Amino acid sequence: MQSRKGSLSIESENMFPIIKKWLYSDHDIFIRELVSNGCDAITKLKKLDIMGEYTLPDDYKPSIQVVVDTEGKSLSFTDTGLGMTEDEVDEYINQVAFSGATDFLEKYKDKANEEQIIGHFGLGFYSAFMVADRVTIDTLSWKEGATPVRWESEGGINFEMSEGDKKEIGTTITLYLSEDSLEFANEYRVREVLTKYCSFMPVEIFLSKEGAEQEYETIDKEELREDDVVVENIVEEAKTEERENENGEKEVVEVSPRKEKVKINKRPVSISTTTPLWMKHPNDCTDDEYKEFYRSVFNDYKEPLFWIHLNMDYPFNLKGILYFPKVNTEYDNLEGVIKLYNNQVFIADISRKLFQSS
């Protein structure tokens, strides 16, 4: 493909009401939007596999990798989704506010479950320019014979598009942060935002820091997985002690058996729990699971008084868990909080005051 430059086409009728309502209301929302885009891309690729239009490799692992580069003042998001062709970048990126998710649903509305497609407005990607002076996209489509594409824009107005060098199907979006947004070049700040918005997304999300020292862990050899990177094999010889038996005679007794262990590169831990408790049937949940979920979500280490598991399909689809906390004294805060998720993506904390009539 030939390298070319251009200006973005903005469908303002769709775009600007959305900007006024929410795009700039929360400075950290761009992370939620970019991760949601990656999740959508993975969901679409899986659906193409289900419909027989694509065959996923046997070792396919749906995931989103977020990498913080503190020295480079950048933040990248890499998904293993369906990627984009040059024409699709033109359609979904260069024409702002034309939603790829909406178009995908329209094409496959009779075959795909639209509830699992997160994007609706096509603006998620452009939230990146809330914090970045320059943004690049490196993408390779799932389509046979597709050419990798590299897209770059400064300020979200003009762009340059050329042939890329991405080898694996999927998309990497890299944000080169502006000076007033360098807080997002901090691993702990990004982890905080990912935990806030993406703890229950249906795809595993991994966070790492560019240039970080490799960490290791030691496990029993029988726990070794195919994807583990073995650094060292360790043998712990059996331990024995000399003890006196019931006859008063001394004998050597094995107190710890011989163990074979391996030192491996530390396994990454996903930030997201892909199947949150509210998605399960109430009959499949234990009291301990309900209590632990309450503690982790609401940061309240007192046990709830009781709870109601909501699982409605009519007149609308609603799943959730309504907890009633214990109130020990008259000084305890009685104001409730509802945590609202749409397709497992955190939307907002809703105070009880919002439901009170004026």
Region locations from a protein language model:
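GHKL (Bergerat-fold) ATPase N-terminal catalytic module, capturing the glycine-rich phosphate-binding loop
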Residues: M1-E179, E183-F184, E192, S199, ...
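GHKL/Bergerat-fold ATPase module in large chromosome/replication-associated machines
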Residues: I117, V135-N158, S178-L182, Y188-S358
